[in-house]
Swiss-Prot record:
Keywords: Acetylation, ATP-binding, Nucleotide-binding, Transport. It comes from Mycobacterium tuberculosis (strain ATCC 25618 / H37Rv). This is Probable ribonucleotide transport ATP-binding protein mkl. GO terms for biological process: cholesterol import. Belongs to the ABC transporter superfamily. The modification N6-acetyllysine is found at K337.
Amino acid sequence: MRYSDSYHTTGRWQPRASTEGFPMGVSIEVNGLTKSFGSSRIWEDVTLTIPAGEVSVLLGPSGTGKSVFLKSLIGLLRPERGSIIIDGTDIIECSAKELYEIRTLFGVLFQDGALFGSMNLYDNTAFPLREHTKKKESEIRDIVMEKLALVGLGGDEKKFPGEISGGMRKRAGLARALVLDPQIILCDEPDSGLDPVRTAYLSQLIMDINAQIDATILIVTHNINIARTVPDNMGMLFRKHLVMFGPREVLLTSDEPVVRQFLNGRRIGPIGMSEEKDEATMAEEQALLDAGHHAGGVEEIEGVPPQISATPGMPERKAVARRQARVREMLHTLPKKAQAAILDDLEGTHKYAVHEIGQ
Protein backbone atom coordinates (compact mmCIF):
# COMPACT_ATOMS: atom_id res chain seq x y z
CA MET A 1 0.00 0.00 0.00
CA ARG A 2 1.40 3.36 -1.02
CA TYR A 3 1.14 6.52 1.08
CA SER A 4 -1.54 7.90 -1.23
CA ASP A 5 -3.70 4.80 -0.74
CA SER A 6 -3.61 5.42 3.01
CA TYR A 7 -4.54 9.09 2.62
CA HIS A 8 -7.25 8.52 0.03
CA THR A 9 -8.95 5.80 2.09
CA THR A 10 -9.01 7.56 5.44
CA GLY A 11 -8.90 11.25 4.53
CA ARG A 12 -5.79 11.70 6.67
CA TRP A 13 -2.30 10.30 6.70
CA GLN A 14 -1.58 7.31 8.92
CA PRO A 15 1.75 5.59 9.65
CA ARG A 16 2.31 2.65 7.37
CA ALA A 17 2.40 -0.77 9.01
CA SER A 18 5.31 -1.91 6.87
CA THR A 19 7.59 -0.86 4.04
CA GLU A 20 6.07 -3.38 1.62
CA GLY A 21 5.63 -1.84 -1.81
CA PHE A 22 8.61 0.49 -1.42
CA PRO A 23 11.92 -0.68 -2.90
CA MET A 24 14.90 -0.50 -0.58
CA GLY A 25 17.18 2.44 -1.26
CA VAL A 26 20.22 1.83 -3.42
CA SER A 27 23.85 2.15 -2.39
CA ILE A 28 26.20 4.87 -3.64
CA GLU A 29 29.76 3.77 -4.48
CA VAL A 30 32.28 6.60 -4.71
CA ASN A 31 35.80 5.79 -5.91
CA GLY A 32 38.79 8.15 -6.13
CA LEU A 33 36.62 11.24 -6.52
CA THR A 34 38.47 14.54 -7.03
CA LYS A 35 36.90 17.96 -7.55
CA SER A 36 38.44 21.39 -8.19
CA PHE A 37 37.23 24.82 -9.17
CA GLY A 38 39.94 26.20 -11.43
CA SER A 39 43.25 25.82 -9.60
CA SER A 40 41.54 25.42 -6.21
CA ARG A 41 41.28 21.77 -5.11
CA ILE A 42 38.11 21.13 -3.07
CA TRP A 43 38.77 17.51 -2.14
CA GLU A 44 40.64 14.62 -3.71
CA ASP A 45 40.63 10.83 -3.84
CA VAL A 46 37.38 10.46 -1.88
CA THR A 47 36.38 6.80 -1.69
CA LEU A 48 33.41 5.45 0.26
CA THR A 49 30.27 3.35 -0.05
CA ILE A 50 27.02 4.70 1.36
CA PRO A 51 25.07 1.57 2.35
CA ALA A 52 21.65 0.97 0.84
CA GLY A 53 18.67 1.85 2.99
CA GLU A 54 20.72 3.26 5.87
CA VAL A 55 21.13 6.77 7.26
CA SER A 56 24.61 8.26 6.88
CA VAL A 57 26.08 11.61 7.94
CA LEU A 58 28.98 13.52 6.39
CA LEU A 59 30.63 15.98 8.77
CA GLY A 60 33.27 18.62 8.29
CA PRO A 61 34.13 22.22 9.12
CA SER A 62 32.61 24.98 7.03
CA GLY A 63 34.29 25.28 3.65
CA THR A 64 35.38 21.65 3.30
CA GLY A 65 33.18 20.99 0.26
CA LYS A 66 30.37 18.97 1.83
CA SER A 67 27.68 20.63 -0.26
CA VAL A 68 29.89 20.30 -3.35
CA PHE A 69 30.03 16.57 -2.62
CA LEU A 70 26.22 16.33 -2.51
CA LYS A 71 25.88 18.23 -5.78
CA SER A 72 28.41 15.86 -7.35
CA LEU A 73 26.40 12.82 -6.22
CA ILE A 74 23.34 14.02 -8.10
CA GLY A 75 25.27 15.14 -11.17
CA LEU A 76 24.89 18.90 -10.72
CA LEU A 77 28.69 19.20 -10.60
CA ARG A 78 31.17 17.05 -12.50
CA PRO A 79 34.36 15.93 -10.70
CA GLU A 80 37.43 15.69 -12.90
CA ARG A 81 38.48 12.24 -11.62
CA GLY A 82 36.87 9.19 -10.09
CA SER A 83 33.52 7.45 -10.36
CA ILE A 84 30.10 7.54 -8.70
CA ILE A 85 28.21 4.28 -9.18
CA ILE A 86 24.46 4.42 -8.53
CA ASP A 87 22.23 1.49 -9.46
CA GLY A 88 24.99 0.12 -11.69
CA THR A 89 25.57 3.39 -13.57
CA ASP A 90 28.62 5.65 -13.35
CA ILE A 91 26.96 9.05 -13.40
CA ILE A 92 30.21 10.79 -14.36
CA GLU A 93 30.56 8.85 -17.61
CA CYS A 94 26.92 8.17 -18.46
CA SER A 95 24.79 9.85 -21.12
CA ALA A 96 22.45 12.75 -20.39
CA LYS A 97 19.47 10.40 -20.73
CA GLU A 98 20.95 7.93 -18.24
CA LEU A 99 21.72 10.75 -15.80
CA TYR A 100 18.13 11.95 -16.05
CA GLU A 101 16.91 8.45 -15.16
CA ILE A 102 19.30 8.19 -12.21
CA ARG A 103 18.14 11.56 -10.89
CA THR A 104 14.61 10.19 -10.57
CA LEU A 105 15.96 8.02 -7.74
CA PHE A 106 16.82 11.14 -5.71
CA GLY A 107 14.97 13.48 -3.43
CA VAL A 108 16.92 16.51 -2.22
CA LEU A 109 16.34 18.72 0.82
CA PHE A 110 18.35 21.85 0.07
CA GLN A 111 19.96 23.94 2.79
CA ASP A 112 17.45 26.79 2.54
CA GLY A 113 14.47 24.65 1.60
CA ALA A 114 14.62 26.13 -1.94
CA LEU A 115 10.90 26.83 -1.97
CA PHE A 116 9.32 29.08 -4.59
CA GLY A 117 8.20 32.20 -2.76
CA SER A 118 5.35 32.84 -5.20
CA MET A 119 3.82 29.39 -4.65
CA ASN A 120 1.92 28.11 -1.64
CA LEU A 121 3.07 24.92 0.07
CA TYR A 122 0.67 22.79 -1.96
CA ASP A 123 2.02 24.00 -5.30
CA ASN A 124 5.62 23.86 -4.08
CA THR A 125 5.17 20.23 -3.11
CA ALA A 126 3.27 19.39 -6.30
CA PHE A 127 5.92 20.95 -8.55
CA PRO A 128 8.07 17.80 -9.15
CA LEU A 129 4.97 15.71 -9.90
CA ARG A 130 3.73 18.21 -12.47
CA GLU A 131 7.18 18.54 -14.05
CA HIS A 132 8.24 14.88 -14.14
CA THR A 133 5.06 12.77 -14.25
CA LYS A 134 1.82 12.59 -16.21
CA LYS A 135 -0.37 12.09 -13.15
CA LYS A 136 -3.84 13.56 -13.00
CA GLU A 137 -4.46 16.46 -10.64
CA SER A 138 -6.59 14.22 -8.43
CA GLU A 139 -3.65 11.82 -8.03
CA ILE A 140 -1.28 14.71 -7.40
CA ARG A 141 -3.57 16.05 -4.70
CA ASP A 142 -3.64 12.71 -2.87
CA ILE A 143 0.16 12.49 -2.91
CA VAL A 144 0.78 16.12 -1.96
CA MET A 145 -1.68 16.15 0.92
CA GLU A 146 -0.29 12.93 2.27
CA LYS A 147 3.33 14.09 2.11
CA LEU A 148 2.46 17.39 3.80
CA ALA A 149 0.67 15.45 6.53
CA LEU A 150 3.67 13.13 6.85
CA VAL A 151 5.93 16.06 7.75
CA GLY A 152 3.38 17.66 10.07
CA LEU A 153 2.04 20.30 7.68
CA GLY A 154 -1.45 18.95 7.13
CA GLY A 155 -3.79 21.94 6.96
CA ASP A 156 -1.01 24.37 6.01
CA GLU A 157 -1.07 23.72 2.28
CA LYS A 158 -2.45 27.17 1.40
CA LYS A 159 0.26 29.07 3.27
CA PHE A 160 3.18 30.70 1.45
CA PRO A 161 6.85 30.27 2.43
CA GLY A 162 7.02 33.85 3.70
CA GLU A 163 4.18 33.18 6.13
CA ILE A 164 5.75 30.24 7.98
CA SER A 165 8.74 29.60 10.22
CA GLY A 166 12.13 28.31 9.11
CA GLY A 167 11.38 24.90 10.60
CA MET A 168 8.13 24.67 8.65
CA ARG A 169 9.95 25.63 5.45
CA LYS A 170 12.43 22.81 6.05
CA ARG A 171 9.59 20.34 6.52
CA ALA A 172 7.88 21.62 3.37
CA GLY A 173 11.14 21.13 1.49
CA LEU A 174 11.30 17.58 2.82
CA ALA A 175 7.72 16.91 1.71
CA ARG A 176 8.63 18.05 -1.79
CA ALA A 177 11.70 15.80 -1.76
CA LEU A 178 9.45 12.82 -0.99
CA VAL A 179 6.71 13.21 -3.61
CA LEU A 180 8.44 11.04 -6.23
CA ASP A 181 9.07 8.23 -3.71
CA PRO A 182 12.88 8.51 -3.93
CA GLN A 183 15.24 5.67 -3.12
CA ILE A 184 17.96 8.15 -2.11
CA ILE A 185 17.38 11.29 -0.02
CA LEU A 186 20.10 13.92 0.25
CA CYS A 187 19.81 16.48 3.07
CA ASP A 188 22.08 19.52 2.85
CA GLU A 189 22.46 20.92 6.39
CA PRO A 190 18.79 20.33 7.31
CA ASP A 191 19.38 21.96 10.71
CA SER A 192 20.57 25.27 9.22
CA GLY A 193 18.65 28.13 10.84
CA LEU A 194 16.82 25.87 13.29
CA ASP A 195 16.99 26.01 17.08
CA PRO A 196 18.02 22.85 18.99
CA VAL A 197 14.44 21.80 19.74
CA ARG A 198 13.29 22.05 16.10
CA THR A 199 16.46 20.26 15.06
CA ALA A 200 15.57 17.39 17.41
CA TYR A 201 12.09 17.16 15.86
CA LEU A 202 13.57 17.17 12.36
CA SER A 203 16.04 14.43 13.34
CA GLN A 204 13.17 12.26 14.54
CA LEU A 205 11.24 12.96 11.35
CA ILE A 206 14.17 11.82 9.21
CA MET A 207 14.43 8.55 11.15
CA ASP A 208 10.68 7.97 10.84
CA ILE A 209 10.86 8.53 7.09
CA ASN A 210 13.66 5.98 6.84
CA ALA A 211 11.46 3.52 8.73
CA GLN A 212 8.54 4.26 6.41
CA ILE A 213 10.19 4.01 2.99
CA ASP A 214 13.56 2.29 3.62
CA ALA A 215 15.39 4.92 1.57
CA THR A 216 19.13 5.57 1.57
CA ILE A 217 19.64 8.90 3.37
CA LEU A 218 22.78 11.05 3.39
CA ILE A 219 22.85 14.10 5.66
CA VAL A 220 25.52 16.77 5.34
CA THR A 221 25.83 18.72 8.58
CA HIS A 222 28.12 20.17 11.21
CA ASN A 223 25.51 19.72 13.94
CA ILE A 224 27.03 17.46 16.57
CA ASN A 225 23.72 16.36 18.10
CA ILE A 226 22.56 15.08 14.72
CA ALA A 227 25.90 13.39 14.19
CA ARG A 228 25.88 11.64 17.56
CA THR A 229 22.30 10.39 17.57
CA VAL A 230 20.92 9.98 14.04
CA PRO A 231 23.16 8.07 11.61
CA ASP A 232 24.03 4.44 11.09
CA ASN A 233 27.28 5.57 9.46
CA MET A 234 29.47 8.66 9.70
CA GLY A 235 32.25 10.28 7.74
CA MET A 236 34.27 13.47 7.92
CA LEU A 237 35.95 15.74 5.36
CA PHE A 238 38.99 17.81 6.36
CA ARG A 239 42.02 19.26 4.55
CA LYS A 240 40.68 18.19 1.15
CA HIS A 241 40.45 14.52 2.15
CA LEU A 242 37.98 12.09 3.64
CA VAL A 243 39.31 11.52 7.16
CA MET A 244 37.20 8.39 7.64
CA PHE A 245 33.85 6.84 6.82
CA GLY A 246 32.19 3.82 8.40
CA PRO A 247 29.89 2.64 11.17
CA ARG A 248 29.04 5.48 13.57
CA GLU A 249 31.03 3.88 16.38
CA VAL A 250 34.29 4.29 14.44
CA LEU A 251 34.13 8.07 14.32
CA LEU A 252 32.50 8.52 17.73
CA THR A 253 35.30 6.58 19.45
CA SER A 254 38.13 7.89 17.26
CA ASP A 255 41.30 9.34 18.78
CA GLU A 256 42.04 11.40 15.65
CA PRO A 257 42.72 14.97 16.93
CA VAL A 258 40.57 16.62 14.25
CA VAL A 259 37.66 14.29 15.02
CA ARG A 260 37.89 14.82 18.79
CA GLN A 261 38.12 18.58 18.35
CA PHE A 262 35.14 18.73 16.02
CA LEU A 263 32.91 16.46 18.11
CA ASN A 264 33.62 18.46 21.26
CA GLY A 265 33.54 21.91 19.64
CA ARG A 266 36.85 23.09 21.10
CA ARG A 267 39.49 25.48 19.83
CA ILE A 268 42.34 23.14 20.71
CA GLY A 269 43.16 21.04 17.66
CA PRO A 270 43.95 21.25 13.94
CA ILE A 271 40.79 23.17 12.92
CA GLY A 272 41.01 26.95 12.94
CA MET A 273 38.95 29.85 11.69
CA SER A 274 40.41 29.31 8.21
CA GLU A 275 39.89 25.52 8.44
CA GLU A 276 43.40 24.56 9.57
CA LYS A 277 46.21 25.95 11.75
CA ASP A 278 49.97 25.93 11.69
CA GLU A 279 52.01 24.24 14.42
CA ALA A 280 52.92 27.52 16.14
CA THR A 281 49.27 28.51 16.59
CA MET A 282 48.41 25.08 17.95
CA ALA A 283 51.28 25.25 20.45
CA GLU A 284 50.22 28.73 21.59
CA GLU A 285 46.63 27.61 22.16
CA GLN A 286 47.79 24.52 24.05
CA ALA A 287 49.91 26.72 26.32
CA LEU A 288 46.87 28.87 27.09
CA LEU A 289 44.87 25.76 27.92
CA ASP A 290 47.63 24.46 30.19
CA ALA A 291 47.57 27.83 31.95
CA GLY A 292 43.87 27.38 32.72
CA HIS A 293 42.27 29.33 29.87
CA HIS A 294 39.00 27.73 28.74
CA ALA A 295 39.19 26.25 25.24
CA GLY A 296 35.48 26.56 24.50
CA GLY A 297 33.15 23.72 23.62
CA VAL A 298 32.19 21.05 26.11
CA GLU A 299 34.07 18.71 28.36
CA GLU A 300 35.41 15.66 26.56
CA ILE A 301 32.46 13.38 25.75
CA GLU A 302 33.27 9.71 25.99
CA GLY A 303 31.34 6.74 24.66
CA VAL A 304 28.67 6.30 22.03
CA PRO A 305 25.20 7.69 22.81
CA PRO A 306 22.12 5.65 21.84
CA GLN A 307 20.85 6.10 18.31
CA ILE A 308 17.38 7.58 17.77
CA SER A 309 14.76 4.92 17.09
CA ALA A 310 11.66 5.26 14.94
CA THR A 311 8.64 6.64 16.75
CA PRO A 312 6.42 3.94 18.32
CA GLY A 313 3.76 2.91 15.83
CA MET A 314 6.10 3.31 12.86
CA PRO A 315 7.39 0.25 10.98
CA GLU A 316 10.59 -1.26 12.30
CA ARG A 317 13.65 0.20 10.58
CA LYS A 318 14.91 -2.57 8.30
CA ALA A 319 18.23 -0.75 8.20
CA VAL A 320 18.93 -1.83 11.78
CA ALA A 321 19.09 -5.57 11.01
CA ARG A 322 21.02 -5.01 7.77
CA ARG A 323 23.56 -2.84 9.55
CA GLN A 324 24.00 -5.35 12.37
CA ALA A 325 24.77 -8.12 9.87
CA ARG A 326 27.17 -5.87 7.97
CA VAL A 327 29.15 -4.66 11.00
CA ARG A 328 29.46 -8.20 12.36
CA GLU A 329 31.21 -9.19 9.15
CA MET A 330 33.61 -6.25 9.26
CA LEU A 331 34.09 -6.13 13.03
CA HIS A 332 37.61 -7.59 13.00
CA THR A 333 38.79 -4.81 10.65
CA LEU A 334 37.71 -1.95 12.94
CA PRO A 335 39.63 -0.17 15.72
CA LYS A 336 39.37 -1.81 19.15
CA LYS A 337 37.30 1.02 20.70
CA ALA A 338 34.79 0.81 17.87
CA GLN A 339 34.63 -2.97 18.22
CA ALA A 340 33.83 -2.66 21.92
CA ALA A 341 31.10 -0.08 21.28
CA ILE A 342 29.54 -2.19 18.52
CA LEU A 343 29.54 -5.34 20.65
CA ASP A 344 27.92 -3.41 23.49
CA ASP A 345 25.20 -2.25 21.11
CA LEU A 346 24.67 -5.65 19.49
CA GLU A 347 24.33 -7.42 22.82
CA GLY A 348 22.51 -4.62 24.63
CA THR A 349 25.20 -4.40 27.30
CA HIS A 350 28.10 -2.20 28.30
CA LYS A 351 30.42 -4.92 29.47
CA TYR A 352 33.19 -4.86 26.88
CA ALA A 353 36.43 -3.11 27.72
CA VAL A 354 38.83 -2.24 24.93
CA HIS A 355 41.57 -4.51 26.28
CA GLU A 356 39.21 -7.52 26.11
CA ILE A 357 38.62 -7.25 22.38
CA GLY A 358 40.44 -9.91 20.41
CA GLN A 359 41.23 -12.08 23.41
